[in-house]
């Protein structure tokens, strides 16, 4: 009986569990928040790279060869999604303290075979590879290079934190995304951080801040991205490097590293918008160039609207001087009119046909019988607030003189099912104390 030839193992990349667990525990709070927009790349260097892509920001965590080893240099790079079916956050699973074995095998160009082991548990699965995923690389050419001590990073987090919290039950319209402007001065060397509300924090050269390359520059980035960047770098509790790269587009590079892993963040510049407090030239000339978009613009539009309908002289002045009561502007219905006004309410500006309160002139010539017949027909339209002058679209032809008649308690329904109340007229007028 011939002995079968043992097949050679495919190229395998595995974790050195002791250093990897030390590194992953520091990053556990960051990895827990990773979502679908994160990929995991295994390289034959060996290294393991997590890359998260957000709007105007790319974050990268690289585990170096201190945490990994490889059996064969022919191992082909593999990139998979961090969010996997049934498992959820893949990298968060590897942060478990119960993990006893983890390795990736190169058996196909289209997938990666992954094995994870724990006491009394073994799991193997294949995950489809993601193709065409580029890894962002650091550029050595930078116009500004500043090293910040961990204490400076902590001060920035305390300063920015209250401005990034989402306020609940805010009645105002949502505001644009907040930004932070970073100014670098060459003489004397200084770096200043300015928020949208005008609050600023400045650091000069000392034992906490070191300037290796200085140039007068300004960059504007999203506040939430910058805050998350500082949180990512703070896990090392080591100095943080801040650089401004201007090779193709202006880019803010923020990184921190230790002996096991490196945290890198690439923030693209947020374009300056009109109305930005940082754009002082626009703020100073906005009223001259655009004519204003606030209160003055609305007043002029009302005046122009009054001029389009030639309803008589001084209409726009009447509109501006009229108190915005129940009648309102146009079609409100009687709240702004007087008791004996022939217009019958605040409808159109014409006198021939009134559309707001409506029908004030037609009730004067009706007899009591006709009023009673009309009341029987329109009694279902009667509201308890009828004496107030009619609500939104006219009160069914009622004015202030006839409102008391329709709301008289003696004219309530006499059916057996209804509840009747005795009406005692009070001749005395109530006086307001």
From Swiss-Prot:
An example molecular function term from Gene Ontology annotations: DNA binding
InterPro entries: DNA_clamp_sf, Herpes_PAP
Keyword Protein transport: no
PTMs per UniProt: Phosphorylated by UL97 on serine residues, phosphorylation seems important for UL44 nuclear entry but does not directly affect its role in replication.
Compositional bias per record (Basic and acidic residues), positions renumbered to this chain: 360-376
Lineage: superkingdom: Viruses
Principal subcellular localisation of the protein: virion
GO BP term (any one): viral DNA genome replication
Protein's UniProt keywords contain Transcription regulation: no
UniProt-annotated stretches for the region Disordered: 274-433
Key words of the record: DNA replication, DNA-binding, Host nucleus, Host-virus interaction, Inhibition of host innate immune response by virus, Inhibition of host IRF3 by virus, Inhibition of host NF-kappa-B by virus, Inhibition of host RLR pathway by virus, Isopeptide bond, Phosphoprotein, Ubl conjugation, Viral DNA replication, Viral immunoevasion, Virion
Record's compositionally biased regions (Gly residues): 325-336, 344-359, 385-398
A GO cellular component entry from the record: host cell nucleus
Subcellular location: Virion; Host nucleus
Family: Belongs to the herpesviridae polymerase accessory protein family.
Functional note: Accessory subunit of the DNA polymerase that plays an essential role in viral DNA replication and acts by increasing the processivity of polymerization. Forms dimers that binds to double-stranded DNA and UL54 specifically to stimulates long chain DNA synthesis efficiently. Plays an important role in maintaining the structure of viral replication compartments by interacting with host nucleolin/NUC. In addition, suppresses innate immune responses through effects on host IRF3 and NF-kappa-B.
Record's comment describing the protein's domains: The C-terminal region is required for viral DNA synthesis.
Quaternary assembly: Forms homodimers. Interacts with host SMARCB1. Interacts with host NCL/nucleolin; this interaction is important for the organization of proteins within viral replication compartments. Interacts with UL112/UL113; this interaction is necessary for efficient viral DNA replication. Interacts with UL84. Interacts with the uracil DNA glycosylase UL114. Interacts with the DNA polymerase catalytic subunit UL54. Interacts with host IRF3. Interacts with host RELA.
UniProt-recorded name of the protein: DNA polymerase processivity factor
Gene name as annotated: UL44
């Amino acid at each position: 009986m011939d002995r079968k030839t043992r097949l050679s193992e495919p190229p395998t990349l595995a974790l050195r569990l002791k250093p990897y667990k030390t590194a992953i525990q520091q990053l556990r709070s960051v990895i827990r928040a990773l979502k679908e927009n994160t990929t995991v790349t295994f390289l034959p260097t060996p290294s393991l790279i997590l890359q998260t892509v957000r709007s105007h920001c790319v974050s990268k965590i690289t585990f170096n060869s201190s945490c990994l080893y490889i059996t064969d240099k022919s191992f082909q790079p593999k990139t998979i999604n961090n969010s996997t079916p049934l498992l959820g956050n893949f990298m968060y699973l590897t942060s478990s303290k119960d993990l006893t074995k983890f390795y990736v095998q190169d058996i196909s160009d289209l997938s990666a075979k992954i094995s994870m082991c724990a006491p009394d548990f073994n799991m193997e699965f294949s995950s489809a590879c993601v193709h065409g995923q580029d890894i962002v690389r650091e550029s050595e050419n930078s116009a500004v290079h500043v090293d910040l001590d961990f204490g400076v990073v902590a001060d920035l987090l305390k300063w920015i934190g209250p401005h990034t919290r989402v306020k609940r039950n805010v009645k105002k319209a949502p505001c644009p995304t907040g930004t932070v402007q970073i100014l670098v001065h060459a003489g004397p060397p200084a770096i200043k951080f300015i928020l949208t509300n005008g609050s600023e924090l400045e650091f000069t050269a000392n034992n906490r801040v070191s300037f290796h390359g200085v140039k007068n520059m300004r960059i504007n980035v999203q506040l939430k991205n910058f805050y998350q960047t500082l949180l990512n770098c703070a896990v090392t509790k080591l100095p943080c490097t801040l650089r401004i790269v201007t090779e193709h587009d202006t880019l803010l590079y923020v990184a921190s590293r230790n002996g096991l892993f490196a945290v890198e963040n690439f923030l693209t510049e947020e374009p300056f918008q009109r109305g930005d407090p940082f754009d002082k030239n626009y703020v100073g000339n906005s009223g001259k160039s655009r004519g204003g978009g606030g209160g003055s613009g609305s007043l002029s539009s009302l005046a122009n609207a009054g001029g389009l309908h030639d309803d008589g002289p001084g209409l726009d002045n009447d509109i501006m001087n009229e108190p915005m009561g129940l009648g309102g502007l146009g079609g409100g219905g009687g709240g702004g009119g007087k008791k004996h006004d022939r217009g019958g309410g605040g409808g159109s500006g014409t006198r021939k046909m009134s559309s707001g309160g409506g029908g004030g002139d037609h009730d004067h010539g009706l007899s009591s019988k006709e009023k009673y017949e009309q009341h029987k027909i329109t009694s279902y339209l009667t509201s308890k607030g009828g004496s107030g002058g009619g609500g939104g679209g006219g009160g069914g032809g009622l004015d202030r003189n006839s409102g008391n008649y329709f709301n008289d308690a003696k004219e309530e329904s006499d059916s057996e099912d209804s509840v009747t109340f005795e009406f005692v007229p009070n001749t005395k007028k109530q006086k307001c104390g």
